[in-house]
């Protein structure tokens, strides 16, 4: 028996004895962590000064932020799962936009949490290391710790201002993929589009603390969310 043949037989035996990377099957729980970026595709109405009407060219925009993203998938069957997206709080600057405010800079800021639940479909057989998936579901966004800047306060000629953003319910869609490096550890990349719409209410106050004006603006934030990270299957 030649040495080459012996090595070939040995290699085949080792490969046969090595455990196959089993991807996902019913009952599996997959947790992922990584960098998640919320990148708003924002647009707004004109600011509406209550009792007066719209202020033409007074609009706002929302910038992006990156935080620790956490996702989970529970396999209901070998190909259908429930997924959840969570993260540490995102912080966004709210900037002036439109013909009247485009150069104003930062007017306010807010933090938000965007928990999102989706039903996911994994089309590949569970023996495949590469597991792409798509999903659709719902998002709830909670806004908190909203603050205005002196720039906004000076722009409206008030002694002080505040802002409050309504929470949002909306649809969500996702596409992503896991690649299994071992039986349990993999890498992941995913993208979501989330429907986030809110109404911001701005209050202006005089030196005595009395409210002298109220303004409202509708903002469609509608972000793309990008995440790259690692996964672990339990």
Language-model features and meaning:
Residues 1-27:
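Cleavable N-terminal export/targeting peptides
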Residues 22-69, 233:
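Short glycine/proline- and aromatic-enriched beta-strand/turn motifs that initiate or cap beta-hairpins
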Residues 60-66, 109-114, 163-170, 218-222:
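Short sequence motifs at beta-strands and strand-loop junctions characteristic
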Residues 91, 95, 182-234:
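Predominantly the C-terminal beta-signal and adjacent terminal strand-loop region
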């Amino acid at each position: 028996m030649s040495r080459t043949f012996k090595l070939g037989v040995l290699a085949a035996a080792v490969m046969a004895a090595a455990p196959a990377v089993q991807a996902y099957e019913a009952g599996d729980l997959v947790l992922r962590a990584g960098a998640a970026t919320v990148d708003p595709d924002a647009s707004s109405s004109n600011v509406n000064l209550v009792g007066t009407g719209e202020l033409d060219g007074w609009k706002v925009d929302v910038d992006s932020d990156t935080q620790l993203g956490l996702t989970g998938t529970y396999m209901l069957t070998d190909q259908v799962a429930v997924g959840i997206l969570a993260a540490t709080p995102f912080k966004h600057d709210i900037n002036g936009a439109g013909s009247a405010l485009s150069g104003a800079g930062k007017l306010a800021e807010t933090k938000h949490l965007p928990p999102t639940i989706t039903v996911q479909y994994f089309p590949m057989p569970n023996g495949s290391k590469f597991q792409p998936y798509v999903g659709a579901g719902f998002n709830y966004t909670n806004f908190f710790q909203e603050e205005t800047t002196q720039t906004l306060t000076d722009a409206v000629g008030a002694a002080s201002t505040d802002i409050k953003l309504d929470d949002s319910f909306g649809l969500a869609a996702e596409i992503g993929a896991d690649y299994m490096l071992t039986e349990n550890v993999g890498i992941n990349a995913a993208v979501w589009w989330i429907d986030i719409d809110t109404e911001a209410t701005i209050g202006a106050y005089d030196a005595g603390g009395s409210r002298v004006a109220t303004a409202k603006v509708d903002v469609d934030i509608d972000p793309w969310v990008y995440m790259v990270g690692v996964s672990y299957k339990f």
